[in-house]
């Protein structure tokens, strides 16, 4: 049952990116990214990454909603173009959806393509050794490693996001 849920989420994930790539208006492109980001967080949650899924959902989608809200407020069209208004855009959208549905049909009919998620040899990536101290949450150890070894990474990431918002605001400000 869980495999089918992940499979359906993966199809919605790809459909969101198809909608983004064939966007006729920036409003619908942002909507496709938001849908794909939310569904991607659901896929991460399904594989046990509850903290990572929640943080990506809150930070990525929250920040993207703020930037998307500002940019669409400054560059809104009076009559936005939809997928059905242009034949080339509609053709790209339908082609992407058909390719996705053919892939789904192929996987479900023949079952020759298998989903493999096996991670062997990840012991080289372990920073903290828990030893014989019992059960530890992998997410808590990852967050501890991020803030102890990755302090500069957190600072550079936060600064990059701030500069990205400022650049987008300057570009969309107009004349």
Swiss-Prot record:
From which residue to which does the signal peptide run? none
The UniProt entry lists membrane topology as: Multi-pass membrane protein
Q: Which Pfam families match?
A: Oxidored_q3 (PF00499)
Might you give the EC number(s) for this enzyme? 7.1.1.2
**Catalytic activity of the protein:** a ubiquinone + NADH + 5 H(+)(in) = a ubiquinol + NAD(+) + 4 H(+)(out)
Concerning InterPro entries, the annotation shows: ComplexI_Subunit6 (IPR050269), NADH_UbQ/plastoQ_OxRdtase_su6 (IPR001457), Nuo/plastoQ_OxRdtase_6_NuoJ (IPR042106)
Q: Kindly state which keywords UniProt assigns to this record, in alphabetical order.
A: Electron transport, Membrane, Mitochondrion, Mitochondrion inner membrane, NAD, Respiratory chain, Translocase, Transmembrane, Transmembrane helix, Transport, Ubiquinone
Cellular component terms (Gene Ontology): mitochondrial inner membrane; mitochondrion; respiratory chain complex I
Please give the Gene Ontology molecular function terms for this protein.
Answer: NADH dehydrogenase (ubiquinone) activity
Where is this chain's protein located in or outside the cell? Mitochondrion inner membrane
GO BP of this protein: mitochondrial electron transport, NADH to ubiquinone; mitochondrial respiratory chain complex I assembly
Q: Which residues cross the membrane?
A: 1-21, 25-45, 47-67, 88-108, 149-169
Q: How does it assemble?
A: Core subunit of respiratory chain NADH dehydrogenase (Complex I) which is composed of 45 different subunits.
Function according to Swiss-Prot or TrEMBL: Core subunit of the mitochondrial membrane respiratory chain NADH dehydrogenase (Complex I) which catalyzes electron transfer from NADH through the respiratory chain, using ubiquinone as an electron acceptor. Essential for the catalytic activity and assembly of complex I.
The UniProt similarity line reads: Belongs to the complex I subunit 6 family.
> Would you tell me the protein name for this molecule?
NADH-ubiquinone oxidoreductase chain 6
């Amino acid at each position: 049952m869980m495999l089918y849920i992940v499979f359906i989420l993966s199809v919605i994930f790809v459909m969101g990116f198809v909608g983004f790539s064939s966007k006729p208006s920036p409003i619908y492109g942002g909507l496709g990214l938001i849908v794909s980001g939310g569904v991607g967080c659901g896929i991460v949650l399904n594989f046990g990454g509850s903290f990572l899924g929640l943080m990506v959902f809150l930070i990525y989608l929250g920040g993207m909603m703020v930037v998307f809200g500002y940019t669409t407020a400054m560059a809104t069209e009076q009559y936005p173009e939809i997928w059905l208004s242009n034949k080339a855009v509609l053709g790209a959208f339908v082609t992407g959806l058909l390719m996705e549905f053919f892939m789904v049909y192929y996987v479900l009919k023949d079952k020759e393509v298998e989903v493999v998620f096996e991670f062997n040899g990840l012991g080289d990536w372990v920073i903290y050794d828990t030893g014989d101290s019992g059960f530890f949450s992998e997410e808590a150890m990852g967050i501890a490693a991020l803030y102890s070894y990755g302090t500069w990474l957190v600072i550079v990431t936060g600064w990059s996001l701030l500069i990205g918002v400022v650049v987008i605001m300057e570009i969309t400000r107009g004349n």
